Amino acid sequence: MAFYLPDWSCCGLWLFGRPRNRYSQLPEEPETFECPDRWRAEIDLGLPPGVQVGDLLRNEQTMGSLRQVYLLAVQANSITDHLKRFDAVRVPESCRGVVEAQVAKLEAVRSVIWNTMISLAVSGIEMDENGLKALLDKQAGDSLALMEMEKVATALKMDETGAWAQEISAVVSSVTAPSASAPFINSAFEPEVPTPVLAPPPVVRQPEHSGPTELALT
């Protein structure tokens, strides 16, 4: 517990001692802020292998460029994480073509992000906000598509009865081939038509009493 000795001033007695820590207003210019450690770690992690510009960004870049590089680094790390987790999933043969195309697209987007980050770090300029937003939105859409395919592939992997999923291509090809899907029919074979069974005709009997003749059906 801290103890304070009272102190006298021209205005009276300071009961808790004379204040020693004065308030200083934070600088309004974001360029004077220190680079957050989280940003630096994210940028270092999101750069291409063998490239480290975290120290360069920390010392020379403005806060605007640093923010853009940080956002790009987050997106690049997200792509890398998706690709690593997706490679560990067993993809059915019928879906492999679509999955490989999507993975190649994500890798291309990540390469564009890497080149943009290096350009911002070296030149010290800021990227147009509309262009940055378009790049981030493009990556976000591709990541959502990849996540949906990842969930489907994961479900197929966990379902032991999903062997039918691996035979989708074979089923589709068999449907398009009539010889493989339709049964063999011999045109020379004439099936025997069964003879219908008819009820016996009604018996007409003559009544025994006299009078007008009446016919009764039994």
Curated annotation (Swiss-Prot):
Compartment list: Host cytoplasm; Virion; Host Golgi apparatus
GO CC entries: host cell Golgi apparatus; virion component
Residues bearing a lipid moiety (S-palmitoyl cysteine): C11
Keyword Phosphoprotein belongs to the record: yes
Pfam family, one: Herpes_U44
Chain segments carrying region Disordered: 199-218
Swiss-Prot/TrEMBL keywords: Host cytoplasm, Host Golgi apparatus, Lipoprotein, Palmitate, Phosphoprotein, Virion
InterPro entries noted in UniProt: Herpes_U44
Annotated transmembrane regions: none
Post-translational modification: Phosphorylated.
Subunit field text: Homodimer. Interacts with BBRF2; the BBRF2-BSRF1 complexes oligomerize which might play a role in tethering the viral nucleocapsids to the host Golgi membrane during secondary envelopment. Interacts with BGLF3.5. Interacts with BALF1. Interacts with glycoprotein gB. Interacts with glycoprotein heterodimer gH/gL.
Function summary: Plays several roles during the time course of infection, including egress of virus particles from the perinuclear space and secondary envelopment of cytoplasmic capsids that bud into specific trans-Golgi network (TGN)-derived membranes.
Similarity annotation: Belongs to the herpesviridae UL51 family.
Protein's recorded name: Tegument protein UL51 homolog
Taxonomic classification: Viruses, Duplodnaviria, Heunggongvirae, Peploviricota, Herviviricetes
